Structures are given as structure tokens and as C-alpha cells.
Amino acid sequence: MSSFPNTVAEGRRSGKAPEKSTFSQTCSLLSQFLKEKRASADSTLGIGGKMEPKANTKALLGSLQNSDGALKLSASAMEFLPQLVENPCIKKSRSPGPESPQLTIFYAGKMLVFDAFPPEKATEVMEMATKLASNNSGTEESPPSLPVTTEKLAVSKMPQTNTSSETPKPGNQGVGSDMRYPRRASLLKFLEKRKERVNARGPYQMNNLKPEGSSSGGEPEDQCSKQFDLNF
């Protein structure tokens, strides 16, 4: 800042005409001002904080070598990429295989679901189920003699049930016998009276009746008289 006013004052004192144009002078003064500003800024940075050390030539050469190696590695990788893309074995190994489906089994009124069940195991399970079903059907069909034995047992048991059902109780038998005798006696009386009426109305009377004491042929005569009276 001190140089700029000094030059202006010296020019005025000398009274000489400026050799350079005002534009060039202002540009030079501006460049000097900027240089002084930069110098002051560098000095303040050096006081406030440490300056970074300048890179050595060895470090620069090492970084260049490392960059060359990285470029070589990248070039070799780019050359190897088409081989990876074209190789089908690598594709198969890296490509994820298809997920195995689920297996659902209905057994004893329940639904069982197995995740990621391979198809080979499913075929084995089906074969085992068919074998067990065939064995069970064979064991059920093998003994045909069982129904015959059951029928025989049923036939042998039938008379026992019939006898037990036919045998009346003593109380019921007495009541039935008491009811049958008066009915029979009243029926006989009715038939005798009817027979007498028929004989009285007929053209001739039947005198071939046997005495009441004959017990051997009493029942067939009563039956014949019943049939005769009913026919009339």
C-alpha cells in the first residue's frame, strides 16, 4: 500500500509526463497489490497452522508406479470379463437354482405342508404309500373264512334267542289260561244252542248223538258239529 502513493507523489513532483498509459499503470499497480495480499495471506497461514510438507520425488514416483499397476490390473480384469460372460459353467454355478416346490399331504383329516421338499423325496413317499396300501388291502382280502364263521355263530345263536322269546312268563301264562277257559265254555254253549235251533227248524231231527260219558270220541264230534254249524 505504501508504494502506490509514493509513486504517484514522485510523478507529481517531477512534473514529467507519464511514459506509460494510465491503463497499464493501473494494471501494474493492481498486480502489485494482489502480490502483497498473497504474501500477507501466506504469512498468516504459516503462523496459524503448519504448512503441509511438499511431496518428495520418491513418493511421486511410487504413486505413479502404483497407478500404472492399477491400470494394468484393470486392463487384465477387463480382458478376463468376456471369458466369464461366455463360460457356461460359471453361469450355471453362479445362477441360483430353482426353488423346490412345497409338498401337501392330507392324512387323518389333517393337512401337512412341507416347504422346499425335493421331487425325488416326494416320489419315494408316494412309492411307500402305495406299498403300504397294497399290503393293507392284501391282509384284508386274505381271510375269506371269517364271514362263514360269523354266519355259523349267528345260526347257532338263533334258536337260543327264539326259545328265550317264545318261553312265556308264569304270570302271563296263568292269566291267558284263565281267559281262554271261559271263552271256550261260552263258545260251546253258543254252538249247542245254535245246533238245537237248527234241528228244531229242520225237516227231521238228528238222533245220532252219543252220550256225554264217551271221552274218546268227544273232541272229533265237537269239531264236526262246529264245522256243520258254521256251514249253515
From Swiss-Prot:
What do we know about what induces or represses this protein's expression?
Answer: (Microbial infection) Triggered to degradation by the pathogenic Pseudomonas syringae HopZ1a protein in a COI1-dependent manner, thereby activating host jasmonate signaling.
Tell me which Pfam families the record gives: Jas_motif (PF09425), tify (PF06200)
Map out region (Disordered) in residue numbers.
Answer: 1-24, 133-232
Q: What is its main location?
A: nucleus
- Domain named Tify: which ranges? 96-131
PTM summary = Ubiquitinated. Targeted for degradation by the SCF(COI1) E3 ubiquitin ligase-proteasome pathway during jasmonate signaling. (Microbial infection) Acetylated by Pseudomonas syringae HopZ1a.
* Composition bias type Polar residues, residue spans: 133-142, 158-167
Q: Where is this motif: Jas?
A: 183-205
Matching entries from InterPro entries are given as: CCT_CS, TIFY/JAZ, Tify_dom
Location of the motif Nuclear localization signal:
182-189
Q: Per the UniProt entry, what are the Gene Ontology biological process annotations, in alphabetical order?
A: defense response; regulation of defense response; regulation of jasmonic acid mediated signaling pathway; response to wounding
Its annotated compartments are: Nucleus; Cell membrane
- Compositional bias per record (Basic and acidic residues), positions renumbered to this chain: 10-19, 190-199
Which tissues is this chain's protein expressed in?
Answer: Mostly expressed in leaves and flowers and, to a lower extent, in grean pods and roots.
Subunit-level organization:
(Microbial infection) Interacts with the pathogenic Pseudomonas syringae HopZ1a protein; this interaction leads to its degradation.
Family, according to the entry, reads as follows: Belongs to the TIFY/JAZ family.
Record comment regarding domains: The jas domain (183-205) is required for interaction with COI1 and Pseudomonas syringae HopZ1a.
Q: Per its record, how is this protein called by name?
A: Jasmonate ZIM domain-containing protein 1
Which organism does this record belong to? Glycine max
- Lineage, top ranks: Eukaryota, Viridiplantae, Streptophyta, Embryophyta, Tracheophyta
